Amino acid sequence: MADDSVLPSPSEITSLADSSVFDSKVAEMSKENLCLASTSNVDEEMPQVEARVIMVQDAGKQEELLKALKTIKIMEVPVIKIKESCPGKSEEKLIKSIINMEMKVPCVKMDSMEEFESLDSPEFENIFVVTDFQNSVFNDLYKADCRIVGPPVILNCAQRGEPLPFSCRPLYCTSMLNLVLCFTGFRKKEELVKLVTLVHHMGGVIRKECNSKVTHLVANCTQGEKFRVAVSLGTPIMKPEWIYKAWERRNEQCFCAAVDDFRNEFKVPPFQDCILSFLGFSDEEKHSMEEMTEMQGGSYLPVGDERCTHLIVEENTVKDLPFEPSKKLFVVKQEWFWGSIQMDARAGETMYLYEKANTPELKKSVSLLSLSTPNSNRKRRRLKETLAQLSRETDLSPFPPRKRPSAEHSLSIGSLLDISNTPESSIHYGETPKSCAKSSRSSTPVPPKQSARWQVAKELYQTESNYVNILATIIQLFQVPLEEEGQRGGPILAPEEIKTIFGSIPDIFDVHMKIKDDLEDLIANWDESRSIGDIFLKYAKDLVKTYPPFVNFFEMSKEMIIKCEKQKPRFHAFLKINQAKPECGRQSLVELLIRPVQRLPSVALLLNDLKKHTADENPDKSTLEKAIGSLKEVMTHINEDKRKTEAQKQIFDVVYEVDGCPANLLSSHRSLVQRVETVSLGEHPCDRGEQVTLFLFNDCLEIARKRHKVIGTFRSPHDRTRPPASLKHIHLMPLSQIKKVLDIRETEDCHNAFALLVRPPTEQANVLLSFQMTSEELPKESWLKMLCRHVANTICKADAENLMYVADPESFEVNTKDMDSTLSRASRAIKKTSKKVTRAFSFSKTPKRALRMALSSSHSSEGRSPPSSGKLAVSRLSSTSSLAGIPSPSLVSLPSFFERRSHTLSRSTTHLI
């Protein structure tokens, strides 16, 4: 912390400088006398002074402060040393520096200013700890040029193990340490003095001029030179409330006023003090922009109102203004509106002033030409191409006609024409990544007689060139700017959001750049015998590698764009600015990103057309067939991956919906088969009457109940990406644990009921789980057959029918009577409350005789169909003796199993991974 400077002085002395005296001397030094000097000799002669802390009034009564002071051993002290500058000259230099001095003297308490004279001694370097910077004692100490700090400084130094800092001004806390502030737009001197004082008390520094060293500009208006400089430098522009709110939090340890979460709340919005009006926009666009104006701190009025400060004009539709604007009114293009939102500050109007176009037709044609021709410095050639462009009737744009804004929201994969159906020539957009848009060969040798094969090959090259330029536009105008560091106003999107939106677009671009170059060489050196199929066979593996990740997640990419556009105004403005550029053809990012989805089918059609116009004796005939086959394999691979992706997405949806769902549910080999809504009929897996959802997977069954109370959250609704979990995890059961599926007969007291006979590996008894189906979409018979089939597949048995057993409800004491009655619901509520109070669980036993009969059936009826009702009595008698050596299937041991149902992982499910 050494800071050296010099000042003429009459003699060479060494002394300790009081903070205010030290600061005043430094301020009085002129630039003519100021030069640097070494401080290597500062420690040669140290003064005989002790460092001491004085606790003023309430500070001496706070035990936390006194305890913190015991851990602080060092204090920063200013030192001034005066010596001759050069031999033989009378001038002398004053050197200042900061040294660390050990605190050997214990702290002293001071209750009033009457004690100050006895404590103010030149033998001590005193630092006063004051809890209130507004009382009279503070003012008296400040007038006496004393070093003053607040309690937060002591606590922070003790926590971090740092010495007590030196400050030439009273320092209450360090929440604005290392911040350099500048002020603009304040007319009342009293308000400005108050703000400056608070900044100094929090450790901040004030600068008169706004330059690159200023970290924050505190503005009371959105005009002036300082404001424009801050905007150009990307300096955060803050409201005065930022300082006041930071001062309110002065006693919070480790609080920093510059953190984004706190600072962003007080940034000056782009349209503060602005009154906008909009001309030439559709009603939908105008309404959206008016809402955005209010969100960004501005207001709006009808066109022509004298109070308006800005008129936003849609330059593509407005040919003339309906009135003569006043000199105070800024008439700007819509790019100013979106640019201000994107940079999170009011942009300079001079760069976006609206100008009436005298010859819009010519201007449009020239702009189109500038996109489609190589850069050239020859005026004659440019003029010739311009005239040729004006004489053409076809539009050179590779994009289809602009859709209505409302159509963008209903965009789907099959809703747009492929790019290959529209272009007539190759279009270049200037510099692109890796020089992708380098000019094509200006003259392509045309055969004397253009064959049909050559025409199709040329069309294939032209569409490939246009497609590469579309990919280059996506990367150059959208992805690269979003990924750039040091964006004005901070990053527009998070890195994971950018990755989700663009995915493997750069990889797809690299592959098609190579294909385009090979096709360009083939067209430039055309020969009927040259193979086009070899080009696509050459890059078939690359296409398989790059396309599935993007196509499979296109819908997710589209959803991410829509979500971010709604939640992040800067991203919405960013898209609007780029969409208006000619490179995009006035198409949205979603419309551009659908091109890779459409490209491979389009190429396959062109290759088929090329094969039709290729002679049988041409070697390329068979090569084209292989190339078409390779493209079909890529598309098949995409479809298979998409199905897998959708299956995995379904599992993720279950994990998000079920609170406490086991992590081992996520597995690459697992897929969701069926979801069934039921009601529990027994005491297990949860209380009778509870709504239970069964998720059947190909190898396990997830059991979850409806949450009684949804988890609350303190997060903003705008930040929530998905609804809270509506279900609570009970148990994840491998299908191998299901020994029997019981189809309960339909009676007056029992409807749509079924049960599962389960044998957990950690238990020595069987468990009966009974349910009533509540969903009408899936018949009970279909559900039970589906369940039995997957259980049989899991245990590697072919006879799935033998897993099902038809039973009477009385045999297992199962009934659905009065499940929805008011009395039944009240009884269940009382029972549940009683369980919570007593912390006890009561388990009703399933009749042993019925369970013995069911278990005997599973052992003795291998390879036979379930017994009919007529033979049920005989079956019961014959099965009794066979169960003599089998432990009783009583549910006495159920508590040890189902009391663990709320655990996320259990020993019975860990092998599912």
From Swiss-Prot:
The modification Phosphoserine is found at S367, S370, S376, S716, S842, S861, S865. The modification Phosphothreonine is found at T359, T373, T444, T846. Phosphorylated by PLK1 in vitro. Hyperphosphorylated during the G2 phase of the cell cycle. Phosphorylation at Thr-373 occurs during the G2/M phase, relieves its auto-inhibition status and stimulates its GEF activity. Phosphorylation at Thr-444 in G2/M phase is required for subsequent binding with PLK1 and Rho exchange activation. Dephosphorylated at the time of cytokinesis. Phosphorylation at Thr-359 is required for its transformation activity in cancer cells. GO terms for biological process: activation of GTPase activity; activation of protein kinase activity; bicellular tight junction assembly; cell differentiation; cell morphogenesis; cellular response to calcium ion; cellular response to hydrogen peroxide; cellular response to ionizing radiation. GO terms for cellular component: bicellular tight junction; cell-cell junction; centralspindlin complex; cleavage furrow; cytoplasm; cytosol; midbody; mitotic spindle. There is a cross-link at K611 (Glycyl lysine isopeptide (Lys-Gly) (interchain with G-Cter in SUMO2)). Coiled coil: none annotated. It is found in: Nucleus; Cytoplasm; Cytoplasm, Cytoskeleton, Spindle; Cleavage furrow. The keyword Transmembrane does not apply. Residues 176-260, 266-354 form the BRCT domain. Highest expression in testis. Also detectable in brain, kidney, liver and spleen. It comes from the Eukaryota. GO terms for molecular function: GTPase activator activity; guanyl-nucleotide exchange factor activity; protein homodimerization activity; small GTPase binding. SMART domains: BRCT, RhoGEF. Keywords: Acetylation, Cell cycle, Cell division, Cell junction, Cytoplasm, Cytoskeleton, Differentiation, Guanine-nucleotide releasing factor, Isopeptide bond, Neurogenesis, Nucleus, Phosphoprotein, Protein transport, Proto-oncogene, Repeat, Tight junction, Transport, Ubl conjugation. Residues 856-870 have a biased composition (Low complexity). Residues 389-415, 427-450, 853-874 are annotated as: Disordered. Residues 452-641 form the DH domain. Homodimer. Homooligomer. Found in the centralspindlin complex. Interacts with NR1I3. Interacts (Thr-359 phosphorylated form) with PARD6A; the interaction is observed in cancer cells. Interacts (Thr-359 phosphorylated form) with PRKCI; the interaction is observed in cancer cells. Interacts with PKP4; the interaction is observed at the midbody. PANTHER family: PROTEIN ECT2 (PTHR16777:SF2). The BRCT domain 1 and 2 are required for the intramolecular interaction, but not for the intermolecular oligomerization. The BRCT domains negatively inhibit its GEF activity in interphase cells. The same BRCT domains may act as a positive regulatory motif for the completion of cytokinesis after the breakdown of nuclear membrane during mitosis. This is Protein ECT2. It comes from Mus musculus. The gene is Ect2.
